[in-house]
């Protein structure tokens, strides 16, 4: 505990808040180019092949970003938009790729939460479109 004299000599410093997404540099999204698109396995106890991409951003950072949704069209040199948001079971993945922008296609046949996956509203006649084989 400092004395009054010590506080007069040097006031208390304001603690700086550490950002959870430094590569965005206080922007909501950033554009980047995929340098590698691959799958990786999550931490225990989960098991899957999660789709991720290594992205070189316009801010100069190179980060690992998660590709959400079922299926994707990304490959090396694809131009993507990323946002903040980590994936809890993938260590080091602190960003998400935004579906439906730039070179990233939206998720096909998505009916719910479409805005999160870049899917356009289906035409009224196509509502019950191919969901699988009918018997």
Swiss-Prot record:
Belongs to the universal ribosomal protein uS12 family. The lineage of its organism: Bacteria, Bacillati, Cyanobacteriota, Cyanophyceae, Gloeobacterales. GO terms for cellular component: ribosome; small ribosomal subunit. Residues 124-135 have a biased composition (Low complexity). GO terms for biological process: translation. Residues 103-135 are annotated as: Disordered. With S4 and S5 plays an important role in translational accuracy. The keyword tRNA-binding applies. Part of the 30S ribosomal subunit. Contacts proteins S8 and S17. May interact with IF1 in the 30S initiation complex. The modification 3-methylthioaspartic acid is found at residue 89. PROSITE patterns: RIBOSOMAL_S12. Gene3D superfamilies: Nucleic acid-binding proteins. One of its GO terms (molecular function) is rRNA binding. Transmembrane segments: none annotated. This is Small ribosomal subunit protein uS12. It comes from the Bacteria. Residues 111-123 have a biased composition (Basic residues). Keywords: Methylation, Ribonucleoprotein, Ribosomal protein, RNA-binding, rRNA-binding, tRNA-binding. InterPro entries: NA-bd_OB-fold (IPR012340), Ribosomal_uS12 (IPR006032), Ribosomal_uS12_bac (IPR005679). PANTHER family: 30S RIBOSOMAL PROTEIN S12 FAMILY MEMBER (PTHR11652).
């Amino acid at each position: 505990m400092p004395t009054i004299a010590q506080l007069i000599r040097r006031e208390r410093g304001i603690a700086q808040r550490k950002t959870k997404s430094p590569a965005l540099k206080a922007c909501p999204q950033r554009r980047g180019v995929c340098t590698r698109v691959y799958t990786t396995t999550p931490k225990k106890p989960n098991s899957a092949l999660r789709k991720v991409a290594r992205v070189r951003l316009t801010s100069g950072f190179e980060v690992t970003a998660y590709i959400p949704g079922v299926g994707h069209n990304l490959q090396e040199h694809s131009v993507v938009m990323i946002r903040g948001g980590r994936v809890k079971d993938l260590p080091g993945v602190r960003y998400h790729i935004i579906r439906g922008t730039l070179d990233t296609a939206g998720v096909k046949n998505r009916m719910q939460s479409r805005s999160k996956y870049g899917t356009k509203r289906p035409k009224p006649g196509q509502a019950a479109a191919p969901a699988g084989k009918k018997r």
